[in-house]
Structures are given as C-alpha cells and as structure tokens.
C-alpha cells in the first residue's frame, strides 16, 4: 500500500536520526527519573535522620532530668544533716521539757502537749551532754526565743539549700549531657574520639560535679547565717504565745523571703556555687587539688565548664528561678500546715481548696511544732509516692513539686539545647 511504502521509505531515510533521538530521549528520561528518585530518597533519609536526632535529644534530655532528681535524693542526707545538727531544735526542746518537769506549770505557761515527741520532729540528734547543759542554763523565756529563731531558720535554710542544690545540679548535669551528646554526634558522623581524652574528660567532669562540695559544706552555713539575721529581725517581738492565722504566718514568711531576695541575692548565689576565685580554690583544694593548674590553661575543659557555670549562676534568670523554687517550698509548707492544723479548710472532696480568709488562729508554738515536722518531710529522700491527699506527707512532696516547676524545665532545656 502507498502509505506503508512511504512510511517504510521515511524510516529508511531517517533511521540513524530516529535511533539517536530515541536513545537520547530514553537516556534523558532515565537520568531525570533517577535524579528525582535519588533526591526523594535523600530527602526521606534526611527527614528520618532529623526525626531520629530530635527523638534522641528528647530522650537524653528526659533521662538527664531524671538523673538530676535521683542525684538530689541521694545527696539530701549529705546536705540536710549538717543543717539539722547546726540548728539543734530537738536539744532545745529537750531542755524545755526537762525544765518543765522540774517546775510547776503556771496558767500562763505553754502546754506540755506542744513539746511532745510526735509534734516536734521526725529527726533525733544525739544528745550531747555539754550542749544540753548549756541550754539547761538558760531560762524558759530564753529557750522559747531560741527555739523560735532556730526552727524558722532551719526551715528557710533547708528550703534555700535544697532548692539551690537542685538548681545547680540541673545546670551541671545538663551542661555535661550536652557535651556527651555532641561527642556521640561526632562519632555517628564518622569522627573519632581519643580514648585517652575520653578517660581524662570523664575525670574532669566528675571533678566539675564535685564543686557542689561548696554548697554541701560551706554554702548552707552562709545561707543559714543570712536567714537567721532576717528571722531575728522579723520575729523578735513575736513570742511563742502569740496567736497567728496561717495567712498572717504566710505573710511573715513572704516578707522574709522578699528581704533575702532583695538585699542578699548575690550572697545567696555565692553560697550556691563558688563564684569567687578564692572560694573556687578552696573547693578544689578539698576535692581535686591536682586540677587547680587547669584554671591557668585557657582552653582547658575544666575552665570552660567553670566559666559557663559561673556565667549562668550569675545570670539574673538563675536567681529568679531560685526564688520561684523557694516560693514553691513555701506554698507547699502552707498547704501542709493547713492540712495538719485546720483540715476542714485544707481540702474538699480530696482536692486542695485553701480558704485562707476563714481560718483559725494558732499559737506560734503550735506552728513551730509543725515546722519541725515539715523539716523532716523536706529532708526525706525515700520519696514515697501516695495518691491520697491524707497520706501525702509520707513522701517528699516538696521535692516532687520543685521538680515539676515549669521555669526549671525551661532553664534546663535552654542549657541542654545551647550548642554554640
């Protein structure tokens, strides 16, 4: 047929051109197709890698915060026992009880029921006869005044010291966790880390963590001295028989915290971490004296860790978070006082509903007895968790509430994610 013959003739005439065109067309299609597929696969791989990295960062961050919490629970006895011994309200109480048994009570005397073992404390110090004889030489009025000052001082000192230790530990462990993550990322990217350097870094990191020695051995005492001065000024004219509502007592605590935050903030920060060079040297001398020379090496890991920590502790945000943590402790204290002294106003239908405007008046002596119990709760590192509000005091609700402060988590996240 003419059509087929002309088509056949066309194909013979343009055979080479058609073959070249077809080859080029299929080659171009194949190359473009492969390029697109490869790009798509690369995008999918990078997306999966990004999600994996984000998940790893999140998992490590959560684990670091849990490690901080467990570390604090382990360190609680190390921090709190010296504070308890330094402010021996149990010994003062024993002297008061002995004096009461040796004299006839008058109508104006405070009831012996306020001095029972159950009401006064969950801690018992070893009775040192010389210390007891010293307190026995004081009058009842002097003993009550001393008990008032020491009980309030112990309570606030524990609040500040525990809050400071938790905040410092969060700071330190998140800095180290960030370093550890970066090293892991380098290894995953094909880089190498010298085993000798890794071993040395571990030693330096442990030495860096041991700088909490300052707060555990020196800082709490400086905080205690500051607190005692403020307590003495605020409660000097209030005696043990004075009746206070929990609302008024809360106001007095707020005034003392505000005084400490306004006029003694830098001193408290200096007590939490050895910011000054002299305090830093003293801390290293008592922990790892061989690392003092690292302070003179500009690019040493130890110096970098200390400089970053000093900068962050000196930052206004650190002080603000510490105040938030102390406020959290104070709020928990007030709730627990209401639960113990005025349970009708403490909760309704198993939920905490505080009606401070319609509560009873209590002698300061009663409040002091409850403060002693709350100090025991603050020091508890067993962290027994209970669902029922009535049994809440069997665990360290103070630590639980501190650990859930939003600004503390935000601060930790900002440190952990700072990869500059």
UniProtKB/Swiss-Prot annotation:
Membrane topology summary: Single-pass membrane protein
Record GO terms (molecular function): protein-macromolecule adaptor activity
Family: Belongs to the peroxin-3 family.
Keyword Protein transport: no
PANTHER family in alphabetical order: PEROXISOMAL BIOGENESIS FACTOR 3
Protein name (database record): Peroxisomal biogenesis factor 3
UniProt-listed GO biological process terms: protein import into peroxisome membrane
Peroxisomal side: 1-16
Topological domain spans for side Cytoplasmic: 38-420
Lineage: Eukaryota, Fungi, Dikarya, Ascomycota, Saccharomycotina
Residue stretches spanning the membrane: 17-37
Pfam families tied to this protein: Peroxin-3
Signal peptide limits: none
Cell compartments where the protein resides: Peroxisome membrane
């Amino acid at each position: 047929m003419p059509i087929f013959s002309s088509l056949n003739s066309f194909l013979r005439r343009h055979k080479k051109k058609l073959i070249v065109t077809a080859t080029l067309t299929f080659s171009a299609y194949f190359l473009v197709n492969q390029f697109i597929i490869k790009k798509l696969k690369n995008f999918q791989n990078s997306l999966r890698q990004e999600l994996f990295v984000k998940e790893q960062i999140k998992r490590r961050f959560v684990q670091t915060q849990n490690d901080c919490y467990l570390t604090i629970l382990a360190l609680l006895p190390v921090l709190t026992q010296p504070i308890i011994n330094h402010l021996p309200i149990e010994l003062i109480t024993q002297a008061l009880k002995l004096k009461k048994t040796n004299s006839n009570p008058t109508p104006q005397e405070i009831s012996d029921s306020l001095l029972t073992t159950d009401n006064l404390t969950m801690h018992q110090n070893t009775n040192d006869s010389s210390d007891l004889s010293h307190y026995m030489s004081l009058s009842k009025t002097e003993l009550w005044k001393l008990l008032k000052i020491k009980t309030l001082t112990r309570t606030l000192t524990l609040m500040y010291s525990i809050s400071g230790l938790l905040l410092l530990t969060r700071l330190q462990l998140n800095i180290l966790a960030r370093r550890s993550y970066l090293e892991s990322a380098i290894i995953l990217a094909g880089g190498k880390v010298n085993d000798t350097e890794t071993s040395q870094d571990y030693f330096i990191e442990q030495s860096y963590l041991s700088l909490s020695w300052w707060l555990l051995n020196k800082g709490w005492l400086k905080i205690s001295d500051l607190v005692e001065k403020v307590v003495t000024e605020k409660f000097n004219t209030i005696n043990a028989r004075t009746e206070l509502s929990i609302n008024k007592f809360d106001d007095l605590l707020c005034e003392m915290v505000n005084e400490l935050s306004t006029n003694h903030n830098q001193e408290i920060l200096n007590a939490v971490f050895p910011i000054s060079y002299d305090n830093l040297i003293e801390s290293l001398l008592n922990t790892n004296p061989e690392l003092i020379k690292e302070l003179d090496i500009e690019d040493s890991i130890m110096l970098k860790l200390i400089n970053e920590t000093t900068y962050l502790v000196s930052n206004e945000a650190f002080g603000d978070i510490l105040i938030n943590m102390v406020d959290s402790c104070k709020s928990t204290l007030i709730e627990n006082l209401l639960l113990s002294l005025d349970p009708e106003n403490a909760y309704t239908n198993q939920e905490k509903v505080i009606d401070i405007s319609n509560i009873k008046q209590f002698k300061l002596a009663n409040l002091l007895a409850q403060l002693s119990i709350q100090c025991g709760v603050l020091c508890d590192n067993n962290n027994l968790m209970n669902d029922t509000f009535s049994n809440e005091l069997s665990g360290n609700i103070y630590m639980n509430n501190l650990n859930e402060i939003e600004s503390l988590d935000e601060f930790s996240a900002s440190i952990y994610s700072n990869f500059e």
